[in-house]
């Protein structure tokens, strides 16, 4: 994408349901940027970066499977996020995928998801999120911006199974 002028305020688009994106909005508001939460994929064309946030599970049909443990699927949101991702990729707009957003990116590039991990691998609890460490891969673009080891919250019962084409793992837990 072309260089942004000094007078231009960076615009970040969060493609998600406003009722479920408050934590993401609060985090990104710490940046000198305009934050727009929307369900309109076309908003992406005028932004500087697309954020695909966490949420429920991806509809398994999108990666060629029947439901074998996926919960809280939102097929309408999945479709909108895939459309926004297509627009961003075509326009050369950077994309950040967080939790489910990362899985959306993986599926869009032909990857698959483990729909329900074994209990000994879970990053969730009936009483709420679990906190655990993640490790940034040292040859990733983000390595220079973030600590190697980060503590994150999660409520995962899914994970990437087969990595999508042309994708690279940059953080592991």
Positions of PLM-derived features:
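Short catalytic/ligand-gating loop segments at beta-alpha or beta-beta junctions
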Residues: 151-157
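N-terminal beta1-alpha1 cap of cysteine-dependent amidohydrolase-like domains
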Residues: 1-98, 106-107, 111-114, 118-146, ...
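Conserved SAM-binding loop
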Residues: 101
């Amino acid at each position: 994408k072309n260089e942004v002028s000094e007078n231009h305020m960076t615009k970040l688009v969060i493609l998600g349901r406003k009722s479920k994106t408050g934590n993401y909005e609060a985090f990104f508001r710490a940046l000198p940027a305009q934050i727009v939460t929307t369900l309109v994929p076309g908003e992406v064309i005028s932004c500087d970066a697309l954020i695909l946030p966490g949420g429920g599970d991806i509809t398994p049909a999108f990666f060629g499977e029947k439901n074998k443990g996926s919960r809280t699927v939102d097929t309408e949101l999945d479709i909108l996020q895939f459309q926004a991702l297509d627009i961003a990729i075509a326009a050369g707009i950077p994309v950040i995928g967080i939790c489910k957003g990362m899985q959306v990116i993986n599926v869009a590039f032909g990857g698959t998801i483990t729909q329900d991990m074994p209990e000994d691998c879970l990053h969730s609890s009936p009483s709420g999120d679990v906190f655990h460490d993640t490790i940034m891969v040292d040859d990733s673009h983000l390595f220079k911006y973030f600590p190697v080891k980060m503590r994150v919250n999660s409520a995962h019962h899914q994970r990437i199974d087969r990595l999508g084409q042309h994708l690279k793992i940059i953080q592991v837990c």
